[in-house]
Each structure stands twice: as structure tokens, then as C-alpha cells.
């Protein structure tokens, strides 16, 4: 007998470190009752099930998905389509629960509605993350989209392997317009590590594009700052003024592209239909050879506390590892959170999301159009905004997801993931955050130590605009925190 669905509650997410003060949580025995979904959905072991652990339904479905830039909008979209709603704020925990540092812990799932649906349907963190990224491509065209470049980092707790996802080098489709890479990149990731059928992941974003979504505050602000030139009629009123927060936007052309992509059997074909339509719009030939996305072993750096993983060049991952290694070797005080590092002429607009389950499987995704609304060139036949990422040799300074695993030999080792969105300054602050985490957790420390609260003295906002996500798995718990504190609502089940 399934447990009745309870009202959804959203909470503010707090910066977290192992030494922070305790916070009560729902008792494990009570929470596990809500995790017994349809057991038949989790019995198929014929495919690669990223992060799945046999024999424990709670650990299979205990997943967390946090969307940095777009989860608040995804929450509102699905709420306005008749889903259960909740109130902002925190809920007093029941007495008698065990304690953790402040933040969000759960034995079950704490996710966005888009990701929640895919997990309930039997998906894993890769399904949830890819599905949510495609929803963001619809509802946050200023930060991401089908025209964006994606980087990803996936850690599979069952194998201990970490894999980097790249879109391939940037390539010009037409002067000032970058070749779109999102669909083949996400399709490749899902084909290797996902569990649900690919078409299932496109149901949500296709519905949002076809039936419409409500413009949220970040998108409305971006429209005011950028102006509507090149963005009409998608994001404009009939008189040419930008849509404000709460206005409804539809993108039926994009919905048609997504329906076509749902039928693609391979990652190469996933973007071909879109590319043909774009070439027709622009009056150019389809490139004879286009960069293909890749999955490759992640860059590694052994540290006393475990092993760090990140994405390879031309992302900022290798440079960040070098900075971390130098800081750890020197033994000097933790550097300024905003060092003069990875200077770029452009401060790109980017989007990030993270997914983690309580077994320690982690997916980090970050994407960018290079600047707000990319090139601001709206393809009339596809509804896609193209990026202006056209330089092959340019370092993607906005892309540097990091994962710290306590030990490769221990399948139950703690896992920490960090991913940032915004300007390169936020990535520098992420380096500072990880150094503080390593300093607070020496190699001999095996468990959380509940001490008085030690609020971080610096936040990424001191460097620039953006969001920093921190996700973790510890003793069969999924945990998340973020800076700014209230950037990212979540939904539990």
C-alpha cells in the first residue's frame, strides 16, 4: 500500500561543512516508509544503472537533485499545472531524530519536480539530471538552452569511476553563431549511464515548450538588462516590450524539435534534425564534420583526504586542480576566495545543476551560451537561441565541476560535489570552499563532528554574481547546501 502524498515543503539551503552545528532530522525508520515505491521498477539489472545498489530500495531511490539557476522556475511551472504546492520556510523536525550539520539531509529524495517525476518513474540520478537540464533549456533561455555548450562530471558509486562529459570544441555555424551541441551531448550521457528510455526524458521539456511556462524573476531581469532585440516574439509582448515575471511564454517550434529529438536512436542523430533546420534558417550549408561529444576518464588529483575529480581541458578543471595542489603543498593559509586566476575578457552567463544519491553517485552539469541570451539570435523555425561560443581554443572558465571521493577502495566512502554557475569569479570561490572543506576534515576524521556553528566568512557573492552548489553523500544520506542561501527551492518525497 503506497503512502499518501504529503504537502510539499520548500526550505532555504544553508552553507555546510562537517563541523557545523547539529540540525534535527526525520527519523530514519519513519522516512523509509515513504521510499517504498513500485519495487518492480528497480528489478531490471540488464542495463548500466548508474549509482544503483542492489537489495536496498531506499538507496536506489534516495536521490537528490538541485538546480542552481532554474529550479525555482521549474517548481513554479509544475505547480501552476496543478501539482501540489507548499510554503516557503522551514518545518520544525519531529523530536527524537538524529542530528546533522545544518543544510538539507534526507534518506529519501530532495529534488525538483521535473527530476522527481523521473525518479518516481524508476530513473536514476543521470535520468533526473538530464531531464532537468532539458527543462532548463526551455525555461531559462538566458542562461542555457539547446544552443549551449555542456560540461559534466559523473561519479558512479558502484564502480568508483568518474567520467567527464564534454561537448567537443566550439565551432562556428555562421559568423558570430556557435554550433549547437546540447542534444547530442546529453543524449550521449544518458545512453551510457541512464536507465529510462530517452523519449521519457523529453516529455517534461516538450510539455513546457508547447503548453507554456511562466517567466520567473531571473529571466525577467535578464530581459530588462539585455533588451528584446532579436528575442521577439518568443519573449516579447505584442508591442515589443519584454515579458515580465509571471507572464506566460510558449515555444511551439522548440517543442517540435524536442519531439523529433525524442525519436533519435543515437547521440549523433539527436542534433541532426535541429542542425538541418538551423542551416536552412541561416542560409548556410550543414558542416560536413562537426565536433562530437565525448565521455572520458576524469582528471584526478590525489589528496590526503581522498581523490579529487574534475573535467579536462579546455574546461577550467585542470587549472583549478593545479591551484589546489599548489595550495595544499605550500601549507600556507587558505588563499583569498577571489585570486587573480583564469582572467577572461568575457564573464559568461552559465547554468548549473547537481544530482546525488545516498549511495554516493553524483552528477554535476554546467552549461553556457557564453553571455546572457548568447548571440540573441532566435532561430524562427526551431525556437532555439544560438550561443556566440565560436573560438575553439577558448578556455571554458565557467566550467569546473569538482568531486571529492574519500577513498576509491571503500564503496561507502563519503562523496562531495561542487559546481558553480555565473562568472569565473564564482569558480575561484569554489576553490576556496574546497580548501576550507579539506582543512576542516583531516584524513583521520571519519565521521561528522557536531560543533558550534562556523558560518563561512566569505561567500561567492563577494567575487561576482552566481550560485555555488555543494552536494554530499555520507552514511546513506544525501545532503545539499548552496550560496546564496535562498537560491534554490527543493521538493522532497
Curated annotation (Swiss-Prot):
Pathway listed: Sulfur metabolism; glutathione metabolism
A UniProt-annotated Pfam family: G_glu_transpept
Molecular function via GO: glutathione hydrolase activity; leukotriene C4 gamma-glutamyl transferase activity
Biased composition (Low complexity): 442-455
Membrane-spanning segments: 55-75
Record carries keyword Transmembrane helix: yes
Record bears the keyword Transmembrane helix: yes
Catalytic activity: an N-terminal (5-L-glutamyl)-[peptide] + an alpha-amino acid = 5-L-glutamyl amino acid + an N-terminal L-alpha-aminoacyl-[peptide]; glutathione + H2O = L-cysteinylglycine + L-glutamate; an S-substituted glutathione + H2O = an S-substituted L-cysteinylglycine + L-glutamate
Biased composition (Acidic residues): 20-32
Glycosylation site positions: 161, 370
EC number(s) recorded for this UniProt protein: 3.4.19.13, 2.3.2.2
Subcellular location: Membrane
Membrane topology (Cytoplasmic): 1-54
Any single Gene Ontology cellular-component annotation: membrane
GO BP of this protein: glutathione biosynthetic process; leukotriene D4 biosynthetic process
Topology versus the membrane: Single-pass type II membrane protein
Family, as annotated: Belongs to the gamma-glutamyltransferase family.
Task performed by this protein: Hydrolyzes and transfers gamma-glutamyl moieties from glutathione and other gamma-glutamyl compounds to acceptors.
Protein name: Glutathione hydrolase 6
Native species: Homo sapiens (Human)
Lineage of source species: Eukaryota, Metazoa, Chordata, Craniata, Vertebrata
Name of encoding gene: GGT6
Amino acid at each position: 500500500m503506497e503512502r499518501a502524498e504529503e504537502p510539499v515543503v520548500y526550505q532555504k539551503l544553508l552553507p555546510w561543512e562537517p563541523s557545523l552545528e547539529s540540525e534535527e532530522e526525520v527519523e530514519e525508520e519513519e522516512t523509509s516508509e515513504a521510499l517504498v515505491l513500485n519495487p518492480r521498477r528497480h528489478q531490471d539489472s540488464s542495463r548500466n544503472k548508474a549509482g544503483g545498489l542492489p537489495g536496498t530500495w531506499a538507496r536506489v531511490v534516495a536521490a537528490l537533485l538541485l538546480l542552481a539557476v532554474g529550479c525555482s522556475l521549474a517548481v513554479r511551472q509544475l505547480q501552476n499545472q496543478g501539482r501540489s504546492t507548499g510554503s516557503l520556510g522551514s518545518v520544525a523536525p519531529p523530536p527524537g531524530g538524529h542530528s546533522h550539520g545544518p543544510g538539507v539531509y534526507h534518506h529519501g529524495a530532495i529534488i525538483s519536480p521535473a527530476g522527481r517525476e523521473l525518479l518516481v518513474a524508476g530513473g536514476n540520478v543521470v535520468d533526473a539530471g538530464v531531464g532537468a537540464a532539458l527543462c532548463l533549456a526551455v525555461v531559462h533561455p538566458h542562461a542555457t538552452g539547446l544552443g549551449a555548450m555542456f560540461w559534466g562530471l559523473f561519479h558512479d558509486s558502484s564502480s568508483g569511476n568518474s567520467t567527464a562529459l564534454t561537448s567537443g570544441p566550439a565551432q562556428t555555424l555562421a559568423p558570430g553563431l556557435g554550433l549547437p551541441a546540447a542534444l547530442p551531448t546529453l543524449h550521449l550521457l544518458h545512453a551510457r549511464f541512464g536507465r529510462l528510455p530517452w523519449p521519457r526524458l523529453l516529455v517534461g521539456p516538450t510539455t513546457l515548450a508547447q503548453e507554456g511556462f511562466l517567466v520567473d524573476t531571473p529571466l525577467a531581469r535578464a530581459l530588462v538588462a539585455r533588451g528584446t532585440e532579436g528575442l521577439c516574439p518568443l519573449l516579447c509582448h505584442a508591442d515589443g516590450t519584454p515579458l515580465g515575471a509571471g507572464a506566460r511564454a510558449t515555444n511551439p517550434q522548440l517543442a517540435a524539435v524536442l519531439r523529433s529529438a525524442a525519436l533519435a536512436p543515437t547521440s549523433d542523430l539527436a542534433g541532426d534534425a535541429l542542425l538541418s533546420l538551423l542551416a536552412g534558417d541561416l542560409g548556410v550549408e550543414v558542416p560536413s564534420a562537426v565536433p562530437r561529444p565525448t565521455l572520458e576518464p576524469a582528471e584526478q588529483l590525489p589528496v590526503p583526504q581522498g581523490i579529487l575529480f574534475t573535467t579536462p581541458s579546455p574546461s577550467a578543471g585542470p587549472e583549478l586542480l593545479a591551484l589546489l595542489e599548489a595550495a595544499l603543498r605550500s601549507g600556507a593559509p587558505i588563499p583569498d576566495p577571489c585570486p587573480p586566476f583564469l582572467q577572461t575578457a568575457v564573464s559568461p552567463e552559465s547554468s548549473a545543476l547537481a544530482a546525488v544519491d545516498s549511495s554516493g553517485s553524483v552528477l554535476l552539469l554546467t552549461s553556457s551560451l557564453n553571455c546572457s541570451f548568447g548571440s540573441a539570435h532566435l532561430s524562427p523555425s526551431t525556437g532555439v537561441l544560438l550561443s556566440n561560443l565560436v573560438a575553439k581554443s577558448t578556455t571554458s572558465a565557467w566550467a569546473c565541476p569538482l568531486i571529492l571521493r574519500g577513498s576509491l577502495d571503500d564503496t561507502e566512502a563519503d562523496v562531495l560535489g561542487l559546481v558553480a554557475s555565473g562568472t569565473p569569479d564564482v569558480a575561484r570561490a569554489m576553490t576556496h570552499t574546497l580548501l576550507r572543506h579539506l582543512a576542516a576534515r583531516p584524513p583521520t576524521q571519519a565521521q561528522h563532528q557536531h560543533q558550534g556553528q562556523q558560518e563561512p566568512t566569505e561567500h561567492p557573492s563577494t567575487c561576482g554574481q552566481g550560485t555555488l552548489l555543494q552536494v554530499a553523500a555520507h552514511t546513506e544520506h544525501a545532503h545539499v547546501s548552496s550560496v546564496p542561501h535562498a537560491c534554490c527551492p527543493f521538493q522532497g518525497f
